[in-house]
């Protein structure tokens, strides 16, 4: 998972030392959400992890709303790059 995190940060960073911009945070959360989606297909009764999963989805939604409000160009390009619905 840490290797994937580094590659995601490298793909979505805004500047050379970027690790915490909204774009990077959304990309990292999306990667973790996709991983957990596959996990829940294998283990449908893992309810404890599902709580954290739903929190991650809510956090990503808040970050997407923030990005949409303050930087629409970045929001639209990020949605396309991550294949998310609007």
Swiss-Prot record:
The keyword Ribonucleoprotein applies. SUPFAM superfamilies: S15/NS1 RNA-binding domain (SSF47060). GO terms for cellular component: cytosolic small ribosomal subunit. GO terms for biological process: translation. NCBIfam families: S15_bact. One of the primary rRNA binding proteins, it binds directly to 16S rRNA where it helps nucleate assembly of the platform of the 30S subunit by binding and bridging several RNA helices of the 16S rRNA. Part of the 30S ribosomal subunit. Forms a bridge to the 50S subunit in the 70S ribosome, contacting the 23S rRNA. This is Small ribosomal subunit protein uS15. It comes from Endomicrobium trichonymphae. The gene is rpsO.
